[in-house]
């Protein structure tokens, strides 16, 4: 649930606006967040706030009617335990699987380091959904990872 507050946290502690927009996050413990989530359940990704690693997530656009109803009941029973977000399209990358090379959904985690100076590391961690069609990239849910490096070409152009 902390994610919903990140823009406010940045403004409070850094006295500046966030550079990158935050993914819209609805807190089901707030009446307007709960109502929006219930009204748009089939369009949203609904996540438990106390879980990690992709557990307990309902991906509305990919869920059956029964799964959506089960999710609705869980949210209604304990709204303070849930958030929802719009479904974000993940890019795909060629991935080596048992049958050859196939496209799989990926996301990229980049890292910044601060001290006397601040810099962004020249690479990151790409997480990949190894199951065909899956949007869940978490390793605990069968996802994999790849080091990602940004290389500079010193050859003249």
Where do the model's predicted regions map?
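Domain-scale recognition of functional cores that engage charged ligands
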Residues: 1-157
């Amino acid at each position: 649930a902390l994610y919903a507050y990140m823009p406010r946290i940045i403004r409070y502690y850094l006295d500046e606006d966030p550079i990158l927009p935050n993914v819209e996050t609805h807190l089901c413990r707030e009446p307007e967040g709960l109502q929006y989530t219930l009204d748009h359940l089939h369009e949203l990704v609904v996540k438990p706030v106390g879980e990690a690693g992709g557990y307990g997530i309902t991906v509305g656009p990919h869920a059956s009617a029964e799964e959506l109803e089960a999710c609705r009941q869980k949210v209604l029973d304990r709204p303070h335990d849930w958030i929802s977000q719009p479904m974000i399209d993940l890019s795909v990358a060629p991935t080596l699987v048992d049958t050859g090379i196939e496209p799989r959904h990926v996301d990229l985690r980049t890292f910044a380091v601060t001290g006397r100076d601040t810099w962004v590391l020249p690479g990151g961690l790409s997480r990949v959904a190894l199951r065909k069609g899956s949007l869940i990239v978490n390793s605990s849910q069968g996802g994999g990872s790849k080091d990602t490096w940004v290389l500079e070409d010193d050859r003249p152009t």
